[in-house]
């Protein structure tokens, strides 16, 4: 590898299935030169879960974590400190970062592993798997039941998650339920690459994300019970959904999933899939329909 790296206006794509399917990570560069191994050069897929401060004096509070212990770094991973329930990290200033890792955490069916809440506006990026596998997160694609339930829910200072990597392809039940609910400032969702779903895996995941305009592409062809229920409810600015499902027979799999989205938009479906209904449980009323 060269001693530095350079990105132009191309988008970066990654594959989780040896090149069969590709997903954008949301990385775009304008041509600036970055020092090799700086955070700007590290692909998000291989970056610890990271909060980027958009204002001075940002700390991140951990709550609903029970006895779980997280670790965080404010010096790009050179040193790490422990963070327990009810504590906040050291503060950093605008443009600086706080990285997180954890392993062996206890998962609560009501609270997941806990909630991470920044004190000022912040973007969240990097690989979520550093909260499951610690330093060994790269290449990991399995998460457990309830793993990230409520992880960022109602954390109103989170303004961007588009560069957050959720690489799991083996999902647990309700693993992402309410993960981003009530994040009223995010506009673009992270990619969701899984093609095999688990019960309730995305239920209410983006509930009340009222600024969301770009939904993740949904590649799974067979839905699981409750898997998409309430997923985009009250996403009032959402105008485009791509869903490639061909079997939507599972119990409550699309219950109220598009209730409260924008009055007009475009729904992209699998070619030949004609079993969709119109309304809150199917294709939004008055939306245009296209085949993928």
Go through each PLM region and give its residues.
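Solvent-exposed loop and capping/linker segments of extracellular ligand-binding repeat ectodomains
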Residues: 41-292
């Amino acid at each position: 590898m060269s001693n530095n790296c350079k990105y132009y206006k191309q988008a970066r794509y990654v594959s989780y299935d040896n090149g069969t399917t590709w997903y954008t990570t949301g990385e775009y560069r304008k041509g600036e030169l970055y020092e090799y191994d700086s955070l700007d050069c590290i692909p998000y897929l291989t970056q610890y879960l990271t909060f980027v401060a958009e204002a001075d004096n940002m700390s991140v509070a951990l709550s609903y974590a029970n006895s779980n212990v997280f670790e965080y770094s404010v010096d790009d991973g050179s040193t790490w400190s422990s963070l327990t329930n009810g504590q906040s990290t050291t503060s950093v200033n605008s443009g600086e970062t706080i990285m997180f890792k954890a392993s062996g955490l206890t998962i609560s069916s009501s609270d997941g592993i806990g909630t991470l809440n920044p004190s000022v506006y912040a973007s969240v990026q990097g690989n979520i798997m550093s909260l499951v596998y610690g330093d060994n997160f790269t290449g990991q694609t399995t998460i457990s039941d309830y793993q990230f339930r409520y992880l960022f829910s109602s954390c109103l200072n989170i303004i961007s998650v588009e560069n957050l990597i959720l690489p799991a392809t083996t999902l647990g039940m309700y693993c992402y339920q309410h993960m981003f609910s009530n994040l009223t400032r995010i506009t673009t969702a992270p990619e969701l690459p899984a093609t095999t779903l688990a019960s309730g895996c995305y239920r209410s995941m983006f509930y009340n994300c009222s600024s969301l305009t770009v939904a993740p592409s949904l590649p799974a062809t067979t839905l699981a019970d409750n898997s998409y229920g309430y997923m985009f409810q009250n996403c009032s600015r959402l105008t485009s959904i791509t869903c490639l499902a061909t079997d939507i027979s599972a119990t409550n799999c699309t219950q109220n999933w598009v209730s409260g989205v924008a009055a007009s938009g475009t729904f992209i479906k699998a070619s030949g899939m004609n079993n969709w209904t119109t309304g809150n449980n199917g294709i939004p009323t008055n939306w245009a329909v296209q085949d993928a």
